């Protein structure tokens, strides 16, 4: 972990994938953007652009577990996405429990002045990505 400086976090979803950036030195994560996905498949050129721009030392992918800690229906898809990130970009990829991050992200959006329109038009996925990456930083650094 000593050689980790910058991380990208991904909140995987079948229609949208939230992205966040975090720094180990500050222990802080912030939202970056939301990528569109088609049945869980992102535009890999957009992902490649983010990797090239930010040059992360590692990637963290949210693992959607059930409340009792067991894998959810989406867990296997998120793990497959994590493996694809590793295979395409040859970076270490970690998974992190993302339970309740979307719920928390909606609360944070409301605290920032409320939701404008639908969550489809104004998603909270990047906020959720920042929350899961922040959780990983707190647990692992």
UniProtKB/Swiss-Prot annotation:
> Which Enzyme Commission number(s) are on file for it?
3.1.-.-
Q: May I ask which residue range the UniProt record assigns to the signal sequence?
A: none
Question: TM segments?
Answer: none
Checking InterPro entries in the record gives: RNaseH-like_sf, YqgF, YqgF/RNaseH-like_dom, YqgF/RNaseH-like_dom_sf
Location, primary (coarse class)? cytoplasm
Where does the source fall among the domains of life? Answer: Bacteria
Keyword Cytoplasm in record: yes
Keyword list (alphabetical) reads:
Cytoplasm, Hydrolase, Nuclease, Ribosome biogenesis
Write out the annotated subcellular location: Cytoplasm
> Which PANTHER family does the record associate with it?
POLYNUCLEOTIDYL TRANSFERASE, RIBONUCLEASE H-LIKE SUPERFAMILY PROTEIN
Q: What is this protein called?
A: Putative pre-16S rRNA nuclease
